[in-house]
């Protein structure tokens, strides 16, 4: 896909420079946009919404591509969607992806954090739930679940995607719910080991909603 009329866009809160353009040259048969997260059904865009009025979606280039302030035209067939999954899904449904505005960022500027979750069952029952799934307190692990100043790990979990498969199960069962408003940190919140930006390159399925807080974002 070719991008022209590129202009700089500065993300003040992240101290990152992105590059504003649009998807007017998008070709679904050639261009690959990698998604990483499911949408929230209640937040999905339904109808009678003008795609032209959408805020730009934010996408990352792959590591082998670099944009800078001298770039006036740019071409790539692969991008990673960072922010704007609901807008992307709606534009796809009505075949108006070419009307989307976008901001492209370099892969080196991408940062990933984990959302906090609240538990919807009693603490003792939640800890028992973890134990029955093989998660026990152990602060020596690299991949696990943080709760009440303890890290719970499962020695059978070999990678971050196994952990997030378990997260999907308990999220789908309403054992945990993402905290969408910034309420600060609390030991009673649940947090999962964050993905690394490199994980976005290898992921081959959609994570459950609100698995990642990726910056820069609008």
Regions found by a protein language model. Name each.
Residues 64, 72-218:
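Basic- and aromatic-enriched surface patches that contact anionic nucleotides/nucleic acids
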């Amino acid at each position: 896909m070719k991008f022209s009329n590129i202009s700089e866009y500065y993300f003040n809160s992240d101290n990152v420079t992105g590059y504003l353009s649009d998807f007017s040259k998008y070709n679904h048969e050639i261009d690959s946009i990698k998604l990483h997260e499911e949408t929230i059904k209640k937040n999905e865009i339904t109808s009678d919404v003008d795609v032209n009025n959408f805020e730009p979606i934010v996408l990352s280039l792959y590591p082998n591509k670099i944009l800078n302030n001298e770039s006036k035209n740019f071409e790539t067939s692969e991008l990673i969607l960072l922010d704007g999954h609901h807008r992307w899904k709606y534009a796809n449904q009505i075949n108006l992806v070419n009307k989307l505005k976008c901001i492209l960022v370099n892969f080196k500027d991408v940062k990933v954090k984990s959302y906090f979750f609240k538990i919807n069952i009693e603490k003792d029952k939640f800890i028992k739930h973890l134990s029955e799934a093989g998660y026990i307190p152990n602060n020596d692990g690299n991949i696990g679940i943080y709760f009440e100043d303890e890290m719970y790990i499962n020695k059978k979990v070999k990678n971050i995607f196994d952990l997030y498969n378990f997260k999907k199960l308990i999220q789908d069962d309403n054992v945990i719910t993402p905290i969408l408003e910034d309420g600060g940190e609390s030991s009673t919140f649940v947090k999962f080991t964050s993905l690394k930006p490199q994980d976005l390159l290898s992921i081959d399925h959609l994570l459950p909603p609100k698995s990642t807080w990726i910056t820069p974002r609008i």
